A protein has these predicted regions:
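C-terminal lobe and adjacent flexible extensions of AdoMet/dcAdoMet transferase-like proteins
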Residues: 173-174, 181-248
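Conserved Class I S-adenosyl-L-methionine
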Residues: 135-155
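Conserved beta-strand signature within the Rossmann-like core of class I S-adenosyl-L-methionine
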Residues: 118-126
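Conserved SAM/SAH-binding beta-strand->alpha-helix loop
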Residues: 36
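Conserved SAM-binding loop of SAM-dependent methyltransferases across substrates and taxa
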Residues: 9-25
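S-adenosyl-L-methionine
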Residues: 42-78
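Conserved class I S-adenosyl-L-methionine
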Residues: 2-8
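A short SAM/SAH-binding and catalytic strip from SAM-dependent methyltransferases
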Residues: 82-101
């Protein structure tokens, strides 16, 4: 069971169907929650049209069970979720509030986990700007306090060195959009929202750890160090190039 909060036009189910053909043969249930019934309805129409068009490529596919839920975060759903996703939603809720982000992140962590079962996983993605980066860092801290394991992007479970405090560095990632469909670029241009780069901050945490996290070998002469690159190339003295990175 999946739960997509702030689903809009079924953004996550559509993205998963397109990007992960191996999931098309699995009988999955998606609870898609949003305050706009029109967006949910429109998204389901898009999803069904895509399903019809991909049949030749994956004839073994089965139609996923899409359950539309109109409401805000906190609205009850019938089943506990194995996987909770939330993309580009929280910033709409905390952006203009006077409450401290520390308090907000704790409250939303409790709300998120109230939807999940004992083995749930959570993926939250926000725009790659300082305030959102700070929120993601605080959300990460709250998830750790709830005994969740951070699977990505962090290679460690200690304090974030780029915690997004005012005037400081914040953890975010930037991708080029040159491989996006030409029609999408054209649509963005016509809306005067042209983008050649997409920037985002995210955290992926889970209660299911043993099967997905490789445990370090104790007393190893060559201990493995995980490194996560977190910046574009930067110029260094003597015509060298480097990148910022986090390590375990």
């Amino acid at each position: 069971v999946f739960l997509d909060l702030g689903s809009g036009p079924l953004t996550v189910p559509i993205a998963l169907w397109l990007a992960c053909p191996s999931l098309r043969s699995k009988k999955l249930t998606f609870y898609c929650l949003d305050t706009s019934q029109n967006a949910l309805s429109f998204g389901e129409e898009i999803f069904l049209s895509i399903v019809a068009k991909t049949y030749k490529a994956t004839p073994e596919q089965v139609e996923w069970n899409i359950i539309r839920v109109k409401g805000e975060i906190g609205t009850e759903i019938r089943k506990k979720a194995d996987f909770i996703t939330c993309g580009n939603m929280f910033n709409e809720l905390y952006w203009n509030t006077s409450k401290p982000l520390e308090e907000i992140s704790k409250n939303y962590t409790n709300l998120l986990l109230s939807y999940g079962n004992e083995k749930t996983s959570v993926l939250v993605i926000e725009p790659g700007v300082p305030r959102s980066g700070r929120f993601i860092t605080l959300l990460r801290n709250s998830l750790i306090r709830k005994k969740m394991t951070i699977l990505s992007p962090c290679p460690h479970m200690v304090d974030c060195p780029m915690e997004g405090k005012k005037g400081g560095k914040w953890c975010h990632f930037t991708l080029l959009t040159d491989k996006a469909p030409k029609k999408l670029h054209k649509l963005s241009d016509s809306a005067k929202l042209s983008k050649d780069r997409a920037s985002f901050s995210f955290v992926f945490a889970s209660n299911v750890v043993d099967s997905v996290v490789e445990k370090p070998v104790e007393n190893s002469k060559n201990p493995q160090i995980d490194i996560r690159v977190v910046s574009d190339p930067i110029r260094l003295p003597r015509e060298k190039t480097g990148r910022y990175a986090c390590s375990s």
